[in-house]
Amino acid sequence: MSRFTGKKIVIIGDRDGIPGPAIEECLKPIDCEVIFSSTECFVUTAAGAMDLENQKRIKEATEKFGAENLVVLIGAAEAEAAGLAAETVTAGDPTFAGPLAGVELGLRVYHAVEPEFKDEVDAQIFDDQVGMMEMVLNVDEIIEEMQSIRSQFCKFND
């Protein structure tokens, strides 16, 4: 059973990293529900902050389904952007600009190149959808950043 089985999934892909549809494809064989998927330009957003509309959607999804049932998957091209997005859905919007300012959701959040995602999905689909970008991204830096954010702010230890 996958860590995503039975979960509601929010995908925030990145135009310059892993796009939303690629992450979605990886999840198709798993019994989970993608409730929202987008592909953003993390570099384009103000200071790399998470899009305000996405913050609103994540807040509403958490209220509707419960934090324990929600997982956020990120495809950011850079560790810093991934960290900002992860911090936003765990500790609240660090820019204090959006609906998640001061709101500690503590959600499970993973990057598409982390083993927590990669090891849970079909290897062939992952290779086809994410493999090329995995070769050019600084995976170690992304993993380190994501683990740091989760260890500080995630309310779930699985």
From Swiss-Prot:
InterPro entries named in the record: GRDA
EC number: 1.21.4.2, 1.21.4.3, 1.21.4.4
GO cellular component assignments: glycine reductase complex
Active site: U44
Gene Ontology molecular function, alphabetical: betaine reductase activity; glycine reductase activity; sarcosine reductase activity
Keyword tags: Oxidoreductase, Selenocysteine
Catalytic activity reported: acetyl phosphate + [thioredoxin]-disulfide + NH4(+) + H2O = [thioredoxin]-dithiol + glycine + phosphate + H(+); acetyl phosphate + methylamine + [thioredoxin]-disulfide + H2O = sarcosine + [thioredoxin]-dithiol + phosphate + H(+); acetyl phosphate + trimethylamine + [thioredoxin]-disulfide + H2O = glycine betaine + [thioredoxin]-dithiol + phosphate + H(+)
Domain of life: Bacteria
Subunit and interaction comment: Monomer. Component of the glycine, sarcosine and betaine reductase complexes, together with components B and C.
Family: Belongs to the GrdA family.
Cited function: In the first step of glycine, betaine and sarcosine reductases, the substrate is bound to component PB via a Schiff base intermediate. Then the PB-activated substrate is nucleophilically attacked by the selenol anion of component PA to transform it to a carboxymethylated selenoether and the respective amine. By action of component PC, acetyl phosphate is formed, leaving component PA in its oxidized state. Finally component PA becomes reduced by the thioredoxin system to start a new catalytic cycle of reductive deamination.
Protein name: Glycine/sarcosine/betaine reductase complex component A
Gene that encodes the chain: grdA
